[in-house]
């Protein structure tokens, strides 16, 4: 595997549960050193996709490659190079925080004790506290420490901030993930499935939005912000001849309008300007706003 090869590659992945298509013909590719967002509503197929990546579920069809390897055939080699934090985490209840981390470290070739000490202090976790006495948020914190200390090439995170309070969430996202990637930016890759999109806004390089197991939109984050625009306009009187049929969505409140554009903001701005508005602003959408707007995009045929 060379330095430009995808860390994750999914081609036409499908997985059914009875008659339900949890994942249906999904394809995506994650490049090294990127923070890749995997977005979708609850039940869209995100966790099923991740489980297929990690050989926790067997796909019905399609191909999955991690580091250029088949995670079914080369499971040990693949998992030695990554860390995974699921939405729900559990530990042996009789072990302390310290014992749990020592147990996790015993399976790893590398373990950074400096990172361990730093994160225990940041999260205010007592090393002697039993796992059975940890809250859901504290268990998530412990899982995150266990995932980052081996300094893996890939972090796979499924709703990693679930159960964390807002202050700890922000510190984890901005400091912990940021520091993980910045220590070796060309090599450290993050694949994060989350519904708290706004909190990862500054870290996401590229993303895929899935809907009913299908790829709805894949873009680089900066390109998406350029493509999806919000136009705010106020007229003295809304002109009868204003044609906004090319807009993704139009919301009107009296003399004011909010218009969503998908790659055609210049065309819409020209149309609006020709009617001499009192006020006109055009701004990029956030990733969360793009996620909401993606529901207006055409869906793939079943």
Language-model-derived ranges and their functions:
Residues 149-153:
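A short, proline-enriched helix->beta-strand linker immediately N-terminal to the Walker B motif
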Residues 62-73, 77-78:
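Conserved ABC transporter NBD signature motif
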Residues 40-45:
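Walker A (P-loop) phosphate-binding loop of ABC-type ATPase nucleotide-binding domains
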Residues 171-267:
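ABC transporter nucleotide-binding domain
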Residues 76, 80, 86-143:
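ABC-family P-loop ATPase nucleotide-binding domains
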Residues 2, 260-302:
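C-terminal coupling/interaction segments
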Residues 155-159, 164:
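Catalytic Walker B motif of ABC-type/P-loop ATPase nucleotide-binding domains
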């Amino acid at each position: 595997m060379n330095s430009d090869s995808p860390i994750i590659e999914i081609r036409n992945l499908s997985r059914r549960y009875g008659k339900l298509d949890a994942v249906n013909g999904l394809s995506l590719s994650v490049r090294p050193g990127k923070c890749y967002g995997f977005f979708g509503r609850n039940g869209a197929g995100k966790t099923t996709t991740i489980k297929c990546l990690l050989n926790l579920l067997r796909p019905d069809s399609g191909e999955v490659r991690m580091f250029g390897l088949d995670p079914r055939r080369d499971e040990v080699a693949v998992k030695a190079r990554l860390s995974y934090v699921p939405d729900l985490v559990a530990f042996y209840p009789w072990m302390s925080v310290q014992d749990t981390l020592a147990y996790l470290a015993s399976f790893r070739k590398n373990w950074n004790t400096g990172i361990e000490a730093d994160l225990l202090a940041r999260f205010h976790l007592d090393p002697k506290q039993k796992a059975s006495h940890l809250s859901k948020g504290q268990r998530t914190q412990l899982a995150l420490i266990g995932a980052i200390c081996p300094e893996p090439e890939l972090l796979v995170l499924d709703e990693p901030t679930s159960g964390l309070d807002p202050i700890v969430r922000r510190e984890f996202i901005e400091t912990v993930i940021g520091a993980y990637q910045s220590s070796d930016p060309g090599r450290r890759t993050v694949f994060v499935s989350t519904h708290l999109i706004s909190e990862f806004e500054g870290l996401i390089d590229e993303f895929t939005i899935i809907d009913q197991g299908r790829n709805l939109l894949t873009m680089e984050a900066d390109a998406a912000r350029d493509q999806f625009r919000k136009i705010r306009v106020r007229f003295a009187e809304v002109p009868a001849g204003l044609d906004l049929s090319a807009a993704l969505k139009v919301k009107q409140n009296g003399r004011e309008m909010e218009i969503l554009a998908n790659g055609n903001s210049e065309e819409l701005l020209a149309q609006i300007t020709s009617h001499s508005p009192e006020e006109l602003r055009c701004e990029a959408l956030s990733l969360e706003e793009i996620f909401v707007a993606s529901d207006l995009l055409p869906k793939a045929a079943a």
